[in-house]
A protein has these predicted regions:
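Short amphipathic alpha-helix that is part of the acyltransferase structural core
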Residues: 1-46, 51-53, 198-202
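Conserved beta-strand in the GNAT
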Residues: 53, 59-70, 83
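Conserved acetyl-CoA binding element of GNAT-fold acetyltransferases
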Residues: 75-98
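Conserved acetyl-CoA-binding loop-helix of GNAT-fold acetyltransferases
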Residues: 95-114
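Conserved GNAT acetyl-CoA-binding A-motif
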Residues: 112-127
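Conserved active-site alpha-helix within GNAT-family acetyltransferase domains
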Residues: 127-148
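Local sequence-structure signature of Cys/Sec-based thiol-disulfide redox active-site neighborhoods
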Residues: 172-209
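Non-catalytic, surface beta->alpha helical segment in thiol-disulfide oxidoreductase systems
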Residues: 244-275
Length: 276
């Protein structure tokens, strides 16, 4: 039986693979309150978010979400268009060819679903082989209209002569407290993603457990809505950025215990530290 798609709504939110009980979370340990992910989806659906849930042999395996640009929680200006928010196929490794093939089919279904109502679809792609890959989106006729490495703003017009989307001007300015002998950590997160909820909680735990906690100033910024995305725009990928004393840290630069080690290293190198 081929994969079937059903419209996303509040009745089938429990079928989303990234919500509590979903396939993406199975067998993994997460920290933080993951029911926030369900609450985020409920709120965005009320604002006009659309989506499709993919079922393989009646088992929920994936989803794709998009929203009108004027409510989409990304720093993208695209009057009359929609914005691709998230897509994921669970149960395979990202490097598995089936993974990207199924994600491609889901996006194709979303494009067909959005084609009549909107002037086009904007998306953010990454210069990365499996994480929102630019190559995958370009295979679906998206074209690059702006770049903020490693992220590209991509555009698929549904009509001739429609206005291209643009990235909003960055509004957020990260802090640098080195002169005071303090490590400023500015971090964005969002309840839209269980990994983001988990990472934000893990960062809080790392900072609270540091022996020189008073030398760390952690500020976390929750970006769930369009207004928050505009006000706190620092990177196009507006809910995954981290700055250490003003230095932007790549989403993939550190993982696991390496964050603890990197923060300890930076605190030790601050002015006034015995190790500096």
């Amino acid at each position: 039986m081929p994969v079937q798609y059903r419209p996303l709504n509040e009745a089938n939110l429990t079928d989303l693979v990234c919500c509590p009980g979903g396939l993406e979370l199975a067998g993994k340990e997460f920290t933080g309150r993951l029911n926030r992910v369900t609450e985020w989806h409920q709120a965005r659906l009320r604002e006009g978010m659309r989506g499709l849930v993919a079922y393989d042999q009646k088992t929920p395996r994936g989803f794709v979400e998009y929203a009108p640009a004027d409510v989409a929680p990304f720093p993208i200006e695209a009057p009359g268009a929609c914005v691709l928010l998230c897509f994921h196929w669970a149960g395979t490794q990202p490097e598995d060819p089936q993974h990207l093939a199924e994600e491609r089919r889901m996006i194709e279904a979303a494009i067909a679903d959005a084609h009549q109502e909107f002037t086009g679809m904007a998306a953010l792609g990454w210069n990365h082989p499996t994480h929102y890959p630019i190559v995958l989106l370009c295979e679906l006729a998206f074209r690059e209209v702006a770049r903020d490495e490693p992220i590209a703003l991509l555009w698929l017009p549904f009509r001739d002569g429609v206005e291209e989307p643009t990235l909003a001007r960055p509004q957020f300015r990260p802090r640098d407290l080195r002169a005071r002998g303090v490590l400023a950590i500015d971090q964005a997160w969002s309840a839209r993603c269980p990994y983001s909820v988990h990472f934000a909680e893990r960062m809080r735990n790392v900072v609270s457990a540091h022996p020189d906690r008073e030398r760390i100033d952690l500020r976390q910024y929750r970006i769930d809505t369009r207004g928050e995305a505009e006000r706190l725009a620092a990177s196009p990928w507006d809910w995954g950025w981290t700055y250490l004393n003003g230095e932007e840290i790549s989403l993939f630069q550190y993982g696991g215990d390496t964050w603890r080690e990197e923060i300890a290293r930076r605190v030790a190198s601050l002015p006034g530290s015995s190790a500096a």
